[in-house]
Curated annotation (Swiss-Prot):
5-phospho-alpha-D-ribose 1-diphosphate binds at residues 82, 85-86, 90, 92-95, 110-118, 122. This is Anthranilate phosphoribosyltransferase. It comes from Desulfitobacterium hafniense (strain Y51). It is an enzyme of class 2 (transferase). Mg(2+) 1 binds at residues 94, 228. Belongs to the anthranilate phosphoribosyltransferase family. Homodimer. One of its GO terms (molecular function) is magnesium ion binding. The keyword Repressor does not apply. Anthranilate 1 binds at residues 82, 113. Catalyzes the transfer of the phosphoribosyl group of 5-phosphorylribose-1-pyrophosphate (PRPP) to anthranilate to yield N-(5'-phosphoribosyl)-anthranilate (PRA).
Amino acid sequence: MTYAIHESLTLLSQKQDLPEELTFTVVQDLLSGELTPAQIGGLLLGLSLKGETPEEIAAFAQALRGAGLKIKAPAGTLDTCGTGGDRSGTFNISTTAAFVIAGAGVPVAKHGNRFASGRCGSADVLEQLGISLKATPESSERHLQHIGMTFLFAQVYHPAMAKVAAERRELGIRTIFNLLGPLLNPAGAPYQLLGVSSPSLLPKMAKALQILGSKRAVVAVGEDGLDEVTLTGATQAILIDGGEIQPFIIRPEEYGLNLCSLQDLQGGTPAENGQITLRILQGKKGPQRDIVLLNAGTALYAANKAAGIREGIALAAESLDSGKALSILEKLKASA
């Protein structure tokens, strides 16, 4: 038993928080294969029962970043990866928004995986749309540079995550690893729109982003529990702008968007979700388009491309209506 896991389990058994340095060391021990399955399970369960702190989340992310593959990216790159876990069954809103954001001129390094909740993850829907999940780091760099968007498949860039796959599966509960995807972008995207599935995660993830040196980001959760900027009502959000953390509320009707029901936003299989995304990019109007505009507009505000969400929505609408968003998809398909 390493010193770090012994000390960590001792503290967690007393429901005490782990110091950042100790957390970083114990994750390194985990990644180097020095922990037993029982120790890994105890660590993850102990953190979950106690409640993870922003410092613990950031330390996990720092250790995993060090173990993952990286790519070079333009300075203004953004990611729309969220935590998932809202179990709402909606279509792939943030993935669809990624094409719109890229069409508006902000490079998007979309980090994602196969489904973790619901029926369709970002990798599943992009595969249906004809985008290769096997792009090398070199080709992803080229896509970002010349097309303005790439998909970074978590399984390719973070193979170390496989070391805890069995323990996570056997525990059968959400753990700190369910929070880490948005913090592990291989392109080091300095701008983010990060959806979370619970209001309690808002301040935690915002603080973790700040610790990790995020340049500017919006963390959001819909009052309906959606891990997106929702269209069914208000969204609680936090803007992280360097050293500043500022809570605010997003109300769709203030931007001329009609409220809808969750049923209006339902997705289905990867094939069905792919068709929804394609129809939106081809110009179909309605609530599905509107929630994509709202999320893309918020992301453009987070990336400093727009002075506010209203201007961001206008830029997003222009990206769709001009065909630029659809063109991003077509170029990525052609490069597969």
